[in-house]
Amino acid sequence: MKVWMAILISILCWQSSAWAVCPAWSPARAQEEISRLQQQIKQWDDDYWKEGKSEVEDGVYDQLSARLTQWQRCFGNETRDVMMPPLNGAVMHPVAHTGVRKMADKNALSLWMRERSDLWVQPKVDGVAVTLVYRDGKLNKAISRGNGLKGEDWTQKVRLISAVPQTVSGPLANSTLQGEIFLKRKGHIQQQMGGINARAKVAGLMMRQGNSDTLNSLAVFVWAWPDGPHLMTDRLKDLATAGFTLTQTYTRAVKNADEVAHVRNEWWKAKLPFVTDGVVVRAAKEPESRHWLPGQAEWLVAWKYQPVAQVAEVKAIQFAVGKSGKISVVASLAPVMLDDKKIQRVNIGSVRRWQEWDIAPGDQILVSLAGQGIPRIDDVVWRGAERTKPTPPENRFNSLTCYFASDVCQEQFISRLVWLGSKQVLGLDGIGEAGWRALHQTHRFEHIFSWLLLTPEQLQNTPGIAKSKSAQLWHQFNLARQQPFTRWVMAMGIPLTRAALNASDERSWSQLLFSTEQFWQQLPGTGSGRARQVIEWKENAQIKKLGSWLSAQQITGFEP
């Protein structure tokens, strides 16, 4: 009983986190948002089940369907499962399709496995479910999953799939099998290639008329033999003898969740003959088939792979001004997990790029990880009914503004502090954007180098800066005084690469001020345009004032 309660709590906790916080909508808006998404999903359902085509990626469909369910629960507007296919199948299944309950994580799976024995793991093949009925050794009927009780008659289609045995013998001569019709692949690596919309492609091939040749691109993975042999090994052997060899090849005995996790990770990275979206763990002991009902299977569960892309709700649009004055746009998101990373923000790019994407708070966007684990936007998959986009700040900033603090300069000023503290410039370890904001808010810096005047006492009494960290920070600030002249010039934002600056052999502020445009132009990677920028930079009043201030502080290279 305690174990079952733990499982229930684990599932509920996972569901709570997955459903997230309910939107702060009025009843009228909730009705509108739910109705719009419901209509769209119904249209996708009709396209998928009636015409065999898909206008949306499988993963996006699944996640938006889950989002609709969440909204319905939030506002007491639950209806039938939107992912349930239309009830237009007329052929009764000899044995009902139960479906499979999904485990939230390894811990939930471990709790489920603890009360069971003789367990086996199989890949969760991504395709469409089917019933195969053999009578007197011949394929008698093939039925689509439908609603689990009734489905479409797919017999003629399945007879054209060469990979499906049309005749069997022995124990299978009069049998009912359940499995997955899938798209045959050569060396499909799920980790690298993703789902390729396999489910929709299979459904399309099965729904279309007159496509007998293309049906040979399909095969079947049998995952259940209701009322079959009691021993799983006997089941697998008989299936393989009959021609269903994949089931034996990809079914393994497991004792615990660690072993399942190992196999799951192996298949995630391995070359497989089909697309998968996780694994299924099943007990060899099953009830008699007459007890099978949709949604009632307690002898098997699924542990799906984490999607390579997640649908995330945009909570806010924020604007940031970089050290060069360029305005960038960032979307704050309701947290989603990607590859064990919690994603709460994604960079959209420039204001123009944001306007092209047409993203507003409340929209649903598809997010994945680019190189080095950086979040990126793949698509806007759903736009809200009520869309209010913020007004971007005026583009009044450039590479020569905001060396000195002011109300309008707040963001670019902070960006300059973050830049000068980075490893490639002054190397101030232990302080980032949050730390700079705390220091500036408390001590009201005059300019980007005002931190050099902070005392140990001031740092220790700064809200947001831990006292244990303040001494280390003061030490870092003092060490910065010993940084080479070129590092300080970089901190001042000189429009040159480090390589060009080092090649200039400039060792003092006075020497740099007297260098001509022709001198800068001859440096590697520095053309006439960049040389003019350097001249404009060194003649800027704010830059000259900073140079004089650093001279008064006896910073290396700035001494009189």
From Swiss-Prot:
SUPFAM superfamilies: DNA ligase/mRNA capping enzyme, catalytic domain, Nucleic acid-binding proteins, RuvA domain 2-like. Keywords: DNA damage, DNA repair, DNA replication, Ligase, NAD. One of its GO terms (molecular function) is DNA ligase (NAD+) activity. It comes from the Bacteria. It is an enzyme of class 6 (ligase). It catalyses: NAD(+) + (deoxyribonucleotide)n-3'-hydroxyl + 5'-phospho-(deoxyribonucleotide)m = (deoxyribonucleotide)n+m + AMP + beta-nicotinamide D-nucleotide. One of its GO terms (biological process) is DNA repair. Transmembrane segments: none annotated. Signal peptide: none annotated. The active site is at K124 (n6-amp-lysine intermediate). Coiled coil: none annotated. Its EC number is 6.5.1.2. Belongs to the NAD-dependent DNA ligase family. LigB subfamily. Catalyzes the formation of phosphodiester linkages between 5'-phosphoryl and 3'-hydroxyl groups in double-stranded DNA using NAD as a coenzyme and as the energy source for the reaction. This is DNA ligase B. It comes from Escherichia coli O6:H1 (strain CFT073 / ATCC 700928 / UPEC).
